[in-house]
Regions:
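N-terminal alpha-helical membrane-insertion module
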Residues: 1-95
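A broadly tuned preference for mixed-charge, low-complexity surface segments
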Residues: 29-34, 124, 157-171, 257-284
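Alpha-helix boundary/N-cap detector
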Residues: 43, 47-50, 171, 175-178, ...
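PLD-like (HKD) phosphodiesterase/transphosphatidyltransferase domain
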Residues: 71-162, 286-309
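Low-complexity, flexible helical/coil segments
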Residues: 142-154, 163-164, 175-182, 236-241, ...
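HKD-type phospholipase D/PLD-like phosphodiesterase module
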Residues: 153-210
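HKD (HxKxxxxD) catalytic microenvironment of the phospholipase D
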Residues: 199-240
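Signature of lipid phosphatidyltransferase scaffolds
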Residues: 226-309
Length: 309
């Protein structure tokens, strides 16, 4: 039943309207049977008791038949509900809305992709806001590319350039390293700022064309290529269950990066702060000022890739 008192059946039928119409039809039939039919040509007077008995018999049979039909409808509708749609195609312009919807209805999130720009800038804040608002614990697993693997970084940047030629100049090895470092630094800080957040970070050594976002309600499969639709698999679908297992195995085969507590829980505001946190995390050791500045910029001004790249 919705806020207007409307109660919908399996096919969206207004139950109250249906029952009211059925009652009105029954009353009309009784009036016709008692007062109209006896006055038709050649009709004999019918006693009230005979009419009531006839009506009760008819209604009893109708009620039994209606009950059987209703049970069949409920049974088959229940089977339909137990077998959700296996996959839905999400238009490029609707991807952000679908991810936001999933983030606002989950207590866990598993990400597997490349730099996690969108996750860091948009999904993660939504997850934290929901956890704080409802007092729930939040479990987050994030798998990004290993920023210290130079060959991997070069392979990814070349792939990213080819996937989006209009932004070819944006992606460089340093840009990719900076975006990944910004994601890790953000997660490291938040994991100690929010007691209800359980966060684990994994470093992958291979590049996939797909980005996986797994929540309690669905799994979203997106691609780096601009203008490409996403695939959404709802919870209960075979692919959703398979993806959960795949993510678990993939994380086990990746390198988990510890998130040590900083003595000052730094929220980097300068190049020296970034250098200190990277040293604490033991990634990108010996990074020069250019890379540190790129990392600081990515951290302080996260970019929504669906809006600009």
């Amino acid at each position: 039943m919705d806020d207007t008192g409307r109660s919908d059946g399996p096919a969206g039928v207004n139950t109250k309207l249906y029952l009211s119409s059925l009652g009105l039809a029954a009353a009309l039939l009784i009036v016709i049977r008692l007062f109209a039919l006896p006055h038709l040509g050649g009709a004999t007077k019918v006693s009230l008791s005979d009419t009531i008995i006839s009506i009760v018999d008819s209604l009893t049979g109708a009620a039994v038949a209606a009950l059987c039909v209703s049970l069949l409808v409920v049974f088959f509708y229940g089977l339909k509900r137990q077998n959700p749609i296996e996959v839905q195609v999400t238009a490029p312009g609707s991807i952000a809305a679908e991810l936001a919807k999933a983030a606002d209805a989950t207590n866990s999130w598993d990400y597997r992709g490349h730099t996690a720009r969108y996750f860091r800038s948009t999904v993660l804040p939504t997850l934290l806001q929901r956890a704080e608002r409802q007092g729930h614990y939040l479990s987050v697993n994030v798998q990004v590319l290993d920023p210290d693997n130079v060959e991997l970084m070069d392979f990814f940047t070349e792939y990213r350039r080819n996937a989006n030629p209009d932004r070819r100049d944006y992606w460089t090895r340093r840009r990719a390293q900076a975006e990944i470092a910004a994601t890790i630094i953000r997660l490291q800080l938040l994991s100690y700022q929010f007691s209800r957040l359980n966060c684990r970070v994994y470093l992958a050594s291979t590049v996939s064309p797909f980005t996986i976002d797994l929540s309690d309600t669905c799994v979203m499969v997106t691609r780096e290529k601009a203008g490409t639709a996403a695939l959404k698999y709802p919870v209960g679908s075979s692919f959703y269950d398979s993806t959960k297992e795949d993510m678990r195995l993939s994380n086990r085969q990746s390198t988990e990066l510890p998130l040590p507590r900083s003595a000052t829980e730094l929220d980097p505001g300068s190049v020296s702060d970034v250098r200190e946190v990277l040293s604490l995390l033991d990634i990108l050791q010996g990074a020069d000022d250019e890379l540190l500045n790129l990392t600081l910029d990515a951290y302080r001004r996260p970019v929504n890739p669906y809006a600009s790249a």
